[in-house]
């Protein structure tokens, strides 16, 4: 079931979790649309990142939940860049890591002439040697550059799939390169993919404010120093929110709170670095 459907231009996500099984996230059907995805967790099993548009995902984790999982199923027709995953991690549970049964695949071409490129990917679980699968179309480009295993070793990609065949009567046949060059990889940048003619810059919204200084506790009163450009503060105990405030203090609840964390929030709602106080 869908966890996210993002159908507009200029969509950005930072530090979000998207969890489902099949079809977790459907991206825009408009191939001029831009999505920027940073520090996110995307989880699923079958075609769980699919659709069109130009999507740049950086420092994200693609988490696979079954053997034979398939990550992307794009349907780009006229996209300039397609799906671009930079400095991401591919991970999964024990079933997904069982390559002897059905290995995880990077993707398959749903419709049209889809594009997907994985650059500087860390693969914490084994990927099927062929890497990709057939579906309904021939990819314009399904490729990798500098894929590495969990230990940082460069993976050999000579067995990656380059020949594709569609489905049905008179099924199309074609090829796609499985590896791009260092020079090509260097063009798949934030500056080339995201700003466009309107100079959209979602990274500004995601900039982390520094951790509050002077964090201290007096009984149930927690205090800290002001952080420049902060619109508010959030107090955590582990993953649990203890409270939110616009000031530089918070009265703690009566139940014991052992380890406390405080972060500033910028004008766009992005969380800053955390100050930590252990009792």
Predicted regions, residues:
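Sequence-level preference for short, compositionally simple segments enriched
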Residues: 1-221, 225-279
């Amino acid at each position: 079931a869908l966890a996210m459907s993002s159908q507009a231009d200029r969509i950005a996500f930072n530090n979000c979790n998207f969890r489902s099984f099949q079809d977790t996230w459907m991206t825009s059907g408009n191939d001029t649309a831009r999505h920027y995805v940073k520090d996110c967790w995307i989880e699923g099993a079958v075609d769980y990142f699919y659709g069109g548009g130009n999507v740049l995902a950086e420092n994200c984790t693609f988490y696979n939940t079954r053997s034979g999982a398939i990550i992307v199923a794009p349907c780009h027709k006229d996209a300039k860049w397609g799906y671009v995953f930079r400095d991401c991690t591919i991970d999964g549970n024990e079933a997904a890591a069982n390559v002897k049964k059905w290995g995880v695949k990077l993707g398959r071409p749903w419709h049209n002439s889809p594009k997907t490129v994985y650059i500087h990917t860390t693969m914490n679980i084994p990927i099927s040697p062929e890497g990709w699968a057939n579906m309904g179309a021939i990819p314009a480009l399904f490729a990798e550059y500098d894929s590495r295993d969990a230990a940082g070793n460069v993976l050999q990609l000579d067995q990656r799939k380059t020949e594709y065949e569609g489905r049905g009567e008179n099924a199309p046949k074609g090829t796609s390169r499985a590896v791009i060059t260092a020079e090509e990889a260097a063009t798949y940048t934030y500056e080339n993919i995201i700003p466009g003619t309107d100079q959209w810059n979602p990274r500004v919204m995601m900039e982390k404010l520094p951790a509050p200084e002077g964090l201290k506790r007096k009984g149930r009163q927690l205090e800290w120093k002001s952080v420049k450009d902060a619109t508010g503060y959030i107090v955590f105990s582990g993953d649990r929110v203890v409270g939110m405030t616009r000031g530089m203090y918070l009265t703690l609840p009566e139940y014991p709170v052992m380890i406390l964390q405080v972060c500033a929030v910028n004008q766009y709602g992005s969380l800053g670095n955390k100050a930590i106080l252990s009792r």
